[in-house]
Swiss-Prot record:
Originating organism: Saccharomyces cerevisiae (strain ATCC 204508 / S288c) (Baker's yeast)
Protein name: Cell wall protein CWP1
A GO cellular component annotation in the UniProt record: fungal-type vacuole
Gene induction: Positively regulated by cell integrity signaling through MPK1 in response to cell wall perturbation. Induction is dependent on transcription factor RLM1. Down-regulated during anaerobic growth. Up-regulated by low pH.
Keywords: Cell wall, Glycoprotein, GPI-anchor, Lipoprotein, Membrane, Secreted, Signal
Domain of life: Eukaryota
Chain positions listed as propeptide in the UniProt record: 218-239
Amino acid sequence: MKFSTALSVALFALAKMVIADSEEFGLVSIRSGSDLQYLSVYSDNGTLKLGSGSGSFEATITDDGKLKFDDDKYAVVNEDGSFKEGSESDAATGFSIKDGHLNYKSSSGFYAIKDGSSYIFSSKQSDDATGVAIRPTSKSGSVAADFSPSDSSSSSSASASSASASSSTKHSSSIESVETSTTVETSSASSPTASVISQITDGQIQAPNTVYEQTENAGAKAAVGMGAGALAVAAAYLL
């Protein structure tokens, strides 16, 4: 069992190491036929906005579903649904990339709220909000690959659990095999010696002088056999 537990812990640690963040990507808004098409996400005194100004972000999605920017800050959701920059401890979780779009809480719908010459970036709809999609664009200009941290974690955990269960099963099987072998050997060693009565060629019955019986404490005791004369009489009677 100690071996099985150690192996399980090692596999779980390895699985955590294998899980990685997404590739780095830019955040580009998509709203065909409007001035919201191809705007970038940037920070205005900590508030995340959509605009065409400089200072746009590159971002990654961490292995626990947080949106991390290239200034080492994270996307945080305010009570009204708008996004701001903040620390990892306050970061929102639930980000992923699916079908070429940034998702939050399994939804690809985001909203832009007019604020002067730019737009406040939000996760909630309001009367003055316009729906947009966010395309994660890699440094090469292509759409970033799909990334789902929850699926990656589940798969790795399941692999580790499966390997741990397999190891535990093998260990138990080995113990059972040893126990079975020991039981068989013990039974063979404690089996009583059976006395066989045989018939000789002239038709008389011949029995050994000593019969061994198994006692309750697995010891053998000898019982004195019948005398030769009594045996002959019994044989004649039977014939």
